[in-house]
Amino acid sequence: MVTAVTPHSGTVNRQYKSSIFAMLFSERKELLKLYNAVNGTSYTDPELLTVNTLENAIYMAVKNDVSFLIGTRLYLYEHQSTWNPNLPLRNLFYVSDLYSAITEERNLYSSKRIQIPTPHFLVFYNGEEKHPDQVVMKLSELYESAEETPELELIVHVLNINQGHNEALLNACRPLREYAAYTAKVRENIKAGYPVREAVEQAVTGCIREGILEEFLRRNRSEAMKVSIYEYDAEKHLRMEREEAREDGYRNGQADG
């Protein structure tokens, strides 16, 4: 097992969580279930995982919900409720900070080779835009000049966890399946016209009653509600920014025409 080093740019996130996904899967027992479901493995010892999520990387531009080490591999898991084609670039910034932390005590100018854990990038998407079960995003797709063999590449696998998508994965991981069900309930309540706070409270109460994330929501009810409201507000802010950008683009196009 690789031991994580506390990052110089932030400590491991043990307190504030920016999302329900981060709250749920920062618990190693639940995170191991998700890892097993994604990779088709059957590990049973949560001690195999070393969580090394950066505490201060929670601002909108560069954040990651959970990063962890297992063996000599580094995994970065994130949920997204809005579609974002810039995920490879964001992950590049984030993993650079992680590698800086992991190698902080080592001499990068040494003649001895410094080995680093192999990275894997995975995003769980549960937004309202329609997308297939899996999408592969590449950093090279963002380059202004396309090259057949780019010298720097980063690949992000985006998995759709909305109803009707990736059912085998959801069936293999109860926490992920119930997380998707909870977020769907919040969204349904908001669409029905409830104020955000009431929509979240009804979703929490309903899920506890129906046995969806029951233990987690009973134990973390107050914090889960606050985080869910924060998540919705952040998602709404991003949607408004995108709509304004589209309107500006349309107006500029009209002016140019």
Q: Which residue stretches match the model-derived regions?
A:
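Elongated, amphipathic alpha-helical interaction scaffolds
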Residues: 1-256
